[in-house]
């Protein structure tokens, strides 16, 4: 990040989040001074191989990636980006998802990914909020609302037909598309995928350029190529085939010291590049200057080739495939008769049709409901004053709350005290209602909401109850759609009704109470607490490696609907019984972040659910609590239990030490953290 920021490039966080200490001061306008060491910013416990920074250096990665696991994706993370990249696939293992082994999830990685150290983390093969091009357009809209200043990028893998997909991406209002080649070098990928999946970036890039030009879409979107790019010659060829930008990964890693031992997934990298072992990390010898020098050589080679071609401006190279030719590099019988005409083909389009990006996408943000909400919330955003009002919402109002949350985080990176902003709404929340809702905002909706409600929630609160005109049984009626609370990292949600499929998929720390779910509830969950007061669908807890779910098993058949390959089903004991039979180190953490008995956690959440939604089911369970508690089943992931045992054996806490941003916030004189300020919680009358 330091090297790329020095030369005006962009570094990519990859999947897994970024330490707020790397960007929080920069966004506040506090520059890095000469002589500052990187450990001064991130902390001695995080940095092993230390080095000195220059005045004006930046540790912020300008490209923030949003992958299927949504690890570390918070409102603040998105707000700190110049570009937000949706990783649909990667060249080394297209369409396969991934897994970070528990052995590589250190305290610091657990902090960044909102997980418990030692717990393996699974990235699903698909984005569970993308099943069509319309869903992709929705996610692009969500991210653009969270950060209006950032470009939205979509990463695709070179394959036959990728041009058609890229055209759909452009129509979905993406600002940028990446075509990744099959040579992707992710060291933790399966060897079979690295060797056999995907096609060269040259083929995918040529098809993308031709398709976009023919459909008059090329002017609206920037195209980037990557996949084992190493030289200035690669850059020029990429530009001639239609690329505006170029991604480098393996070559800069080698410059920093990578010797390609193919041990990335084993945590035993001998040069400290891809390991969390502090002894091995101390061997890291890379410096920002090494990467800067490498890119100067790449740029110089590209300049020389441009001079040979008689091209003055790099923009004039883009799409000039007519300047490419072939010559025999090898003699091989398989290469005989190959025809490259389709790669070098120039689309038959009028001369005035642009071959590169010359305009920006219209995302229609001026028409968003959040524009009105932000205006009403200015006293809270600018001065921290409490704001409370009512507003109507309709299902055409998409992504309500994301733009407001982004604005809040820009003024108050740590969020605001609870319920500083309280908005009571009536009607139907559209897609992604309450997405990325920041700390200090409460949405109290009387009505219902569509798919993706609470996606990426980052400390806010959502409470949804049926309309006062509703006369049915909430336990038998859907109140929120599919894929609710996808990747939510903190905050709480209360739904008086049934949720659709994939409720709380990839939940990373938020708390939720619902009165029933569809299939695949709590799939790939890694943290947080879920309470289900009614019946679940099939395949509950598939891939669940962290957090805890409490399910009311009225008919005694929940075990047949639960996927127990990674979880154990336990009774919810009274506090006295649990203290007598269970090591306190294995107790789940409540809202305050300290271990509590299951009885206390569960009862408190049901009480909160009743307070916020007036749930009849919650009242019924509380009125006969001892009998109700006996019918609850605790879904406890085996990985989580093992990690807690190991941490207890080592005498460690499950929360990592404060990093630079947290330490500086704690030590700032005369300033109280938002979390230190208490305010009474109560729903609107």
Predicted ranges, named:
Residues 78, 217-218, 298-300, 524-525, ...:
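A structural signal for short secondary-structure junctions
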Residues 10, 116-120, 145-146, 184-188, ...:
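Short acidic (Asp/Glu) and glycine-rich catalytic loops that position anionic groups and cofactors
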Residues 71-226, 230-261, 265-275, 303, ...:
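Alpha/beta enzyme core
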